[in-house]
Amino acid sequence: MGYEKSIEAYKKAEQLMPGGVNSPVRAFKSVDMPAIFMDHGKGSKIYDIDGNEYIDYVLSWGPLILGHENPQVIENLHKAVDKGTSFGASTLEEIKLAELVIDRVPSIEKVRMVSSGTEATQDTIRLARGYTGRDKIVKFEGCYHGHSDSLLIKAGSGVATLGLPDSPGVPEGTAKSTITVPYNDLDAIRKAFELYGDDIAGVIVEPVAGNMGVVPPVEGFLQGLRDITNEYGSLLIFDEVMTGFRVGYNCAQGYFDVIPDLTCLGKVIGGGLPVGAFGGKKEIMDEIAPVGTIYQAGTLSGNPLAMTSGYETLSQLTPESYEYFNELGDMLEDGLKKVAAKHNVPMTVNRAGSMIGYFLNDGPVTNFEQANKSDLKLFSEMYREMAKEGVFLPPSQFEGTFLSTAHTKEDIERTIEAFDKTFERITNK
């Protein structure tokens, strides 16, 4: 398997874009291999510019829950493009997608469409602060909520630490309005509220953490957050940009039966086009302009192409789709555990529906500290060998893999076989 064309393309890209990419992970630095440039996808497969075929478990980092080039999505996108790409005014497509989202997401009575997950989270934080009249936000170590200043915060030591900037360019004053605590740790949350409860506008959480690998909530964690925020009059915010419509038909909140005050969405609801959304109770959402005084706007918010792609994607998902995801997920999870044990490779497999994370350590992995104990050198070796076997995985130990309705049992069998061959090679060097 060669990457000659990708290598040449990357050399040119480096002269034009910082690091040669428009999102850092695409540089493949953490796995020490050339950045792969993709050409096209179909079903569960993706093809690079050198002509290599891969079973795709990245799926554009989650949005393509129906796989690549879904016929219904593509057909209706063509029809939408023929009408025009953007109008700067409302369209019927916005209503169709909004109705579907409100019907399926338990917490959402009204929804505002935006153009990215980062927009959704930053606007939700502003809304929470404006609605409560409080400034502080609680987030969790290892949870990523986009790249807005108030959420790019590094966790400090101790139980509840006022944030320090995790990136140059984030003012320390902004960071101090964010409290970071360990994921899955209710004692830390209680301590944070004992210290700052009257100033906390809300708690934002990934109901299944997906940016330290896949880390599901321990039993009682989400309900505990619901109870504590209710006690202190703070808002509970679920960042379901990744988990929305992926963990379950009614999102993670339906799957775990814990209902937040506000929900952030993205990825799947755009079917591969740029999109985000946030929604919640009417009384909170009606604080947003033009009804209320909390300002939010966007040139391309609710654009007809993303609305069409999102509607045509969600309309094809049924409860049976998630039964299929669980069938494939069980198969892949069991297979990974067996081949890892066969070759004495330390591996912990976490899964929530069609999100699967594998950590090269002995586990368990329930928080960011435990995820960080993974063998990154071994992961890098594994990644390169899996690419040679025609399996496209996220080029980072701290990202999850995804399934689609286009994946087949044959894909899963081939993937398990590829892991078997890979572990055979890297453990016998």
Swiss-Prot record:
It catalyses: (S)-4-amino-5-oxopentanoate = 5-aminolevulinate. Its cofactor is pyridoxal 5'-phosphate. SUPFAM superfamilies: PLP-dependent transferases. It is found in: Cytoplasm. Pathway: Porphyrin-containing compound metabolism; protoporphyrin-IX biosynthesis; 5-aminolevulinate from L-glutamyl-tRNA(Glu): step 2/2. The modification N6-(pyridoxal phosphate)lysine is found at K267. Gene3D superfamilies: Aspartate Aminotransferase, domain 1, Type I PLP-dependent aspartate aminotransferase-like (Major domain). GO terms for biological process: protoporphyrinogen IX biosynthetic process. One of its GO terms (cellular component) is cytoplasm. It is an enzyme of class 5 (isomerase). PROSITE patterns: AA_TRANSFER_CLASS_3 (PS00600). Its EC number is 5.4.3.8. NCBIfam families: hemL (TIGR00713), PRK00062.1 (NF000818). Homodimer. This is Glutamate-1-semialdehyde 2,1-aminomutase 1. It comes from Staphylococcus carnosus (strain TM300). The gene is hemL1.
